[in-house]
Amino acid sequence: MAATPDKGKALELALAQIDKQYGKGSVMRLGDETRAPIEVIPTGSISLDVALGIGGLPRGRIVEVYGPESSGKTSVALHAVANAQKLGGTAAFIDAEHALDPEYAKAIGVDTDSLLVSQPDTGEQALEIADMLIRSGALDIIVIDSVAALVPRAEIEGEMGDSHVGLQARLMSQALRKLTSALYNAKTTAIFINQLREKVGVMFGSPETTTGGKALKFYSSVRLDVRRIETLKDGSDAVGNRTRVKVVKNKVAPPFKQAEFDIIYGIGISREGSLIDMGVEQGIIRKSGAWYTYEGDQLGQGKENARKFMRENPDVANEIEKRIKEKLGIGAQVDAETADPAPVDF
């Protein structure tokens, strides 16, 4: 039904009043202008960037990373922090678990000298600090590790056996209502690391659930389920884990894709290993028996030798990464060591 001239005029007056009161762009027609592509922060694994559909974690959104203990949740978050810093951004880490290892963070590539770290006493303090940092508009990424450790003040000050049903869920719900718009306006990515619990008496379906109530599930634009699927060994010594990440929720691209990559102890996600896996899958790297070749040049016999060759020849790794991203249409290469810092828009 077409709008009458009177209705159209009334609407224009209302829109003018809204723009005057709340700022230009507060209300707009969906077809007026094309939306800018979603800005991203690379994860450090090209296979995970591809699974996310846009080339990394979306800026201005909430991301939940959950999984069993020692599955690689913090490693994934720290790689995102390192990549944000390489792009010239500022990062913060709310260490509610008081378990951040600075040496491991540095090995992953995090600039620990400029990383903002807080070890709060209560959940309220943690979320208030996060809110103030986000509203400053100067932050590109913030990690909260973990939701389970955001203990409400009443629980800390109470007796050990006291019942505090639903306190943490209410705290999270209230905080996320405040944080969502602030994150969007500041283009800050918030990564909430979460733990798994088991629901008692579940007969059908998965008994696993995450802590902190249901609010985080709703407010998250991306939810990543991180699982360790295999132990990597050098002879009889364990040197790392094979990790599978499933994108169980994705508001910015099709969900339910998954990625596999290696996490090497003391080093983090093997970028070269991910490039080899994706290169073979996309036909950019040729695998014949145990040998890997690229453009007729041998990378090595066996994955470990190919990985070592690419680590020693970063130009080859960067070229392969660029070709994979161009073929899959997920944006430019951004996490090369030699890349110039990109300007940061707030």
From Swiss-Prot:
GO MF term list: ATP binding; ATP hydrolysis activity; ATP-dependent DNA damage sensor activity; damaged DNA binding; single-stranded DNA binding
UniProt xrefs under InterPro entries: AAA+_ATPase, DNA_recomb/repair_RecA, DNA_recomb/repair_RecA_CS, P-loop_NTPase, RecA-like_C, RecA-like_N, RecA_ATP-bd, RecA_C_sf
CDD domains recorded: RecA (cd00983)
Claim: ATP-binding is one of the keywords in the record: yes
GO process terms (BP): DNA recombination; DNA repair; SOS response
Main location: cytoplasm
Residues the record lists as binding ATP: 67-74
Keywords: ATP-binding, Cytoplasm, DNA damage, DNA recombination, DNA repair, DNA-binding, Nucleotide-binding, SOS response
Transmembrane domains' residue ranges: none
GO cellular component, one term: cytosol
UniProt keyword annotation of DNA repair present: yes
Subcellular location: Cytoplasm
Family assignment from sequence similarity: Belongs to the RecA family.
Known function: Can catalyze the hydrolysis of ATP in the presence of single-stranded DNA, the ATP-dependent uptake of single-stranded DNA by duplex DNA, and the ATP-dependent hybridization of homologous single-stranded DNAs. It interacts with LexA causing its activation and leading to its autocatalytic cleavage.
NCBIfam families: tigrfam_recA
Name the UniProt record assigns to this protein: Protein RecA
Organism phylogeny: Bacteria, Bacillati, Actinomycetota, Actinomycetes, Pseudonocardiales
